[in-house]
């Protein structure tokens, strides 16, 4: 049996790849998990629901605001200090064999505590451009798993530890009750901008079927008036729908792109350009370069442009599904290091 402490949350984009790794590890060996969730965020809710067997501890932290000298960061830094003491207490008691971290501020807290206690650290970065937590933790990690070859350019000092694996995707046996539709989604929090654009697209494309994850009950009601649209406030598990989709329209969060690539669904990406260091734009451009996507910049995203691009991606057709889930590569690497 191995004991694993894990953190990576605040958004679905960090959480789902982490769950994919833990679920794959559990298929290979007996695993006991201590999960550090961000209080009040998606990780708390999803982990308690999907993995009641994990020991889940909620930690009250928020990320540092940019620019880093933002006045509110003084208070946030103090909270990070308190959280670190709490995390250390749990780690000392649980005595994990390793820590798996997938980014976000909670990873930073858990990673630095684990480093002080000499616990082996494994990190995964989902995006092309690494976030602050992964940049800091790479120096202490045993291995740094990355989704894209290009990420090496941002972590030059740690080349020997980097393994390009791709971004883990959660598996599901479930199947959506529909088929041959265009899947529309924001990130794990939905996207007002995409909802507004698509509301203008739907009446123009009555022959095309859409499934739209709206992010709110109000939007679900508003978009349900279109006969060609199945509007859902949140889709769970998303894999059930990716399997049956012919194309997608979304933001350019790393997990959404990972799922497009894993399930072989070509798509339109409208990156959220205010994301830290424009990382969504970099993700989107990489997905386009790899042949999975058409990128529409926010300032050019009109209903007309989307309609033209839907036609192109649908005509392109499905791409071959990935043979091996990156989660499986990562599990093998981790077990190879510690067993
Ligand atoms: C707003 C924000 O900070 N976004 C970041 C966040 O991910 P954010 O959660 O916004 O976006 P991602 O695309 O990475 O992940 C979304 C995840 O939510 C799932 N989903 C979505 C809708 C739904 O109804 N059901 C469902 O399960 C998707 O299948 C996917 O697994 O972390 C990512 C990884 O570091 C970054 O690339 C994103 O830029």
From Swiss-Prot:
Pathway(s) this gene product operates in, as recorded in its UniProt entry: Cell wall biogenesis; peptidoglycan biosynthesis
GO CC annotation: plasma membrane
Reaction equation(s) it catalyzes: di-trans,octa-cis-undecaprenyl diphospho-N-acetyl-alpha-D-muramoyl-L-alanyl-D-glutamyl-meso-2,6-diaminopimeloyl-D-alanyl-D-alanine + UDP-N-acetyl-alpha-D-glucosamine = di-trans,octa-cis-undecaprenyl diphospho-[N-acetyl-alpha-D-glucosaminyl-(1->4)]-N-acetyl-alpha-D-muramoyl-L-alanyl-D-glutamyl-meso-2,6-diaminopimeloyl-D-alanyl-D-alanine + UDP + H(+)
Cross-referenced Pfam families: Glyco_tran_28_C, Glyco_transf_28
GO biological process: carbohydrate metabolic process; cell division; cell wall organization; lipid glycosylation; peptidoglycan biosynthetic process; regulation of cell shape
EC number in record: 2.4.1.227
Subcellular location field: Cell inner membrane
Keyword annotations from UniProtKB, A to Z: Cell cycle, Cell division, Cell inner membrane, Cell membrane, Cell shape, Cell wall biogenesis/degradation, Glycosyltransferase, Membrane, Peptidoglycan synthesis, Transferase
Major subcellular site: membrane
S-S bonds: none
Membrane topology: Peripheral membrane protein
Presence of keyword Cell inner membrane: yes
Domain of life: Bacteria
NCBIfam families xrefs: murG (TIGR01133)
Annotated PANTHER family: GLYCOSYLTRANSFERASE (PTHR21015:SF22), UDP-N-ACETYLGLUCOSAMINE--N-ACETYLMURAMYL-(PENTAPEPTIDE) PYROPHOSPHORYL-UNDECAPRENOL N-ACETYLGLUCOSAMINE TRANSFERASE 1 (PTHR21015)
Family from the record: Belongs to the glycosyltransferase 28 family. MurG subfamily.
HAMAP family given in the database record: MurG
Protein name: UDP-N-acetylglucosamine--N-acetylmuramyl-(pentapeptide) pyrophosphoryl-undecaprenol N-acetylglucosamine transferase
Source organism: Thermotoga maritima (strain ATCC 43589 / DSM 3109 / JCM 10099 / NBRC 100826 / MSB8)
Taxonomic classification: Bacteria, Thermotogati, Thermotogota, Thermotogae, Thermotogales
Gene, per the UniProt record: murG
């Amino acid at each position: 049996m191995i004991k694993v402490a894990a953190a990576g949350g605040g958004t679905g984009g960090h959480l789902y790849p982490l769950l994919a790794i833990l679920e794959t590890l559990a298929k290979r060996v007996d695993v006991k998990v201590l999960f550090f969730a961000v209080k009040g965020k998606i990780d708390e809710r999803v982990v308690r629901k999907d993995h009641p067997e994990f020991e889940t501890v909620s930690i009250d932290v928020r990320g540092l605001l940019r620019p880093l000298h933002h006045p509110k960061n003084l208070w946030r830094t103090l909270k990070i200090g308190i959280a670190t003491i709490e995390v250390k207490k749990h780690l000392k008691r649980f005595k994990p064999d390793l820590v798996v971290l997938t980014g976000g501020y909670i990873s930073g807290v858990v990673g630095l505590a684990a480093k002080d206690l000499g616990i082996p650290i494994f990190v995964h970065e989902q995006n092309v451009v690494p976030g602050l937590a992964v940049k800091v933790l790479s120096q202490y990690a045993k291995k740094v798993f990355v989704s894209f070859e290009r990420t090496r350019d941002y972590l030059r000092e740690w080349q020997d530890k980097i393994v390009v694996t791709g971004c883990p995707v959660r598996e599901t046996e479930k199947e959506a009750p529909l088929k041959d539709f265009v899947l529309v989604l924001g990130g794990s929090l939905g996207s007002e901008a995409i909802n507004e654009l698509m509301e203008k697209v739907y009446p123009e494309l009555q022959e095309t079927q859409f499934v739209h994850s709206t992010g709110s009950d109000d939007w679900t009601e508003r978009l349900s008036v279109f006969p060609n649209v199945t509007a859902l406030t949140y889709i769970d598990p998303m894999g059930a729908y990716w399997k049956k989709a012919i194309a997608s329209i979304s933001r350019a969060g790393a997990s959404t792109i990972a799922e497009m690539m894993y399930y072989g669904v070509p798509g339109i990406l409208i990156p959220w350009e205010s994301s830290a260091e424009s990382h969504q734009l970099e993700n989107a451009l990489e997905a386009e370069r790899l042949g999975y996507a058409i990128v529409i910049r926010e300032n050019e995203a009109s209903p007309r442009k989307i309609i033209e691009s839907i036609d192109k991606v649908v005509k392109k057709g499905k791409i071959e599904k990935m043979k091996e889930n990156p989660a499986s590569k990562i599990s093998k690497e981790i077990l190879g290091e510690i067993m």
